[in-house]
Amino acid sequence: MSKTFLRPKVSSTKVTDWVDPSFDDFLECSGVSTITATSLGVNNSSHRRKNGPSTLESSRFPARKRGNLSSLEQIYGLENSKEYLSENEPWVDKYKPETQHELAVHKKKIEEVETWLKAQVLERQPKQGGSILLITGPPGCGKTTTLKILSKEHGIQVQEWINPVLPDFQKDDFKGMFNTESSFHMFPYQSQIAVFKEFLLRATKYNKLQMLGDDLRTDKKIILVEDLPNQFYRDSHTLHEVLRKYVRIGRCPLIFIISDSLSGDNNQRLLFPKEIQEECSISNISFNPVAPTIMMKFLNRIVTIEANKNGGKITVPDKTSLELLCQGCSGDIRSAINSLQFSSSKGENNLRPRKKGMSLKSDAVLSKSKRRKKPDRVFENQEVQAIGGKDVSLFLFRALGKILYCKRASLTELDSPRLPSHLSEYERDTLLVEPEEVVEMSHMPGDLFNLYLHQNYIDFFMEIDDIVRASEFLSFADILSGDWNTRSLLREYSTSIATRGVMHSNKARGYAHCQGGGSSFRPLHKPQWFLINKKYRENCLAAKALFPDFCLPALCLQTQLLPYLALLTIPMRNQAQISFIQDIGRLPLKRHFGRLKMEALTDREHGMIDPDSGDEAQLNGGHSAEESLGEPTQATVPETWSLPLSQNSASELPASQPQPFSAQGDMEENIIIEDYESDGT
């Protein structure tokens, strides 16, 4: 039997693997041939997935004896390779969920996805258009696994889009293109967008091809897109056109899965803005990070099974180490499983073998009796945390809450020395968090974090003197970051002064036993500075457009010239100029000004630029996002204008400014000249 006979049994890695493991180099270092390892991995995974029970139970099955091996297996040494693969198989694949009960996802989220699948797939109307679902959430929270398990249980086919790999451009192909003796041959190329459109058309029109082991007794199917073509991130309008067309001609549901990112790249807002979601009726289901309690149960189950099977070959972590792993993975269960396997697979010299027949509970008692000193124990926990290796991130809502609520730990006289009596008013308990670390984990620039802090700090104070002191710290922090020449150097110092100053100024929260009148929830809001700064930039553009004859900067034009023009009785025929002067040059006669409308800050906000709320100029030096990218801004130009050159410059007016409504009849009116009568006549 030749090796080619085994090749049709090898399926795609995308289908068999739950996730690309981080331990592929284990198999590369082995002496097993490629065809042997591949065929074994596919056969074992397919048998465990389809015909066997759950993963945790199937891992207890013993291997076959040597006498039952075929001649082909003995030739290629499959006995040793099976033992090697069973010992070094990535745990993220070995313990992947197979049923709903094994999912580390909240039951309400599973029911929400299942309800959508039943309504859009199982109860779908014949002439119903294409429905679209957007699933978001942090990496490793079970988005794709939940969808595939529910689809498998309900008998729904999943046709998944995978970005095609372009063929390599060989040197001979390059020579053949420019060979004068032969005909000109272009290198065959097709854009990913064209391939993606063709895939959607074929997937919604034809059924899935029946592969080895597939069950196609049902015609219910969904299209899954998790890895979008890269061109859509540059030109999102092309994706929007594809979505609009699919809603009209689609025959099966289309599901997109996008992972959240706290590093500043908000792909959901770029690819699926609010307008497109409302226009195409896109449903949105957001997953939360895996809860520490659920993750702890999942890791304990893996540790128990591995300890019973390979107790002498792995290092069994204790409860403290597992809790440290759960804290360091930030709700990513894949990262936690990989870290658990990596931390347990240490060298033979560091292994602590157990005696035969010793249970895991007795081994834990033995480890407690032989526990080392505290500094060594702390170093071991730090080693496990370093193995986890994932940066801990905070949403903006939680980061602001840690600063504004400023929880503290009570100290005794033995813990730290007290301040002298003349400095007793500055005495505070130790903070539970480091403000600099909180800002760093929020993945936000320091000056932007100060804006959110300035907007919300007043509601957390009880004394006016404390508010005055906190405002002084914020003012000093703004001075440090005000100069653009030194902003990059002093930004971290400015944020440190602002955060620590606000926390220190709040005397009502200066001690652990008094938390500012209780720890009741207070809503947070986005800074009003965004709306005010947007209005200021629009007024500058309008002033330059309406008064081009005055060669003055926008600031001087609005503070020195326009207020005086509002007091003069110079007639003007341009209604836009009149409205603008009345808006800028005259203040309303109000004793009490109402607060601007505030936009609430949700618990999943990233604090990044939001074009719908006027945040696009927050960090671009007063320019909009389009101007910073070099894109021209569009303006509303009325078609009925026929003004002189001195007044016909409103083509750059923003849409929020009043536009002139003069018609052709108004332009033919005579100019009214008012005579000045002196007191002596």
Swiss-Prot record:
Region described as Disordered: spans on this chain: 42-61, 344-377, 606-681
Subcellular location: Nucleus; Chromosome
Compositional bias of kind Polar residues: 631-662
Reported impact of S656D: Abolishes interaction with RAD1
Region of interest (Interaction with MCM7), ranges: 432-681
GO BP terms in the entry: DNA damage checkpoint signaling; DNA damage response; DNA repair; DNA replication checkpoint signaling; mitotic DNA replication checkpoint signaling; mitotic intra-S DNA damage checkpoint signaling; negative regulation of DNA replication; protein localization to site of double-strand break
InterPro entries referenced in this protein's UniProt entry, alphabetically: Checkpoint_prot_Rad17_Rad24, P-loop_NTPase, Rad17/Rad24_fun/met
Family assignment from sequence similarity: Belongs to the rad17/RAD24 family.
Function summary: Essential for sustained cell growth, maintenance of chromosomal stability, and ATR-dependent checkpoint activation upon DNA damage. Has a weak ATPase activity required for binding to chromatin. Participates in the recruitment of the 9-1-1 (RAD1-RAD9-HUS1) complex and RHNO1 onto chromatin, and in CHEK1 activation. Involved in homologous recombination by mediating recruitment of the MRN complex to DNA damage sites. May also serve as a sensor of DNA replication progression.
Protein name: Cell cycle checkpoint protein RAD17
Species of origin: Homo sapiens (Human)
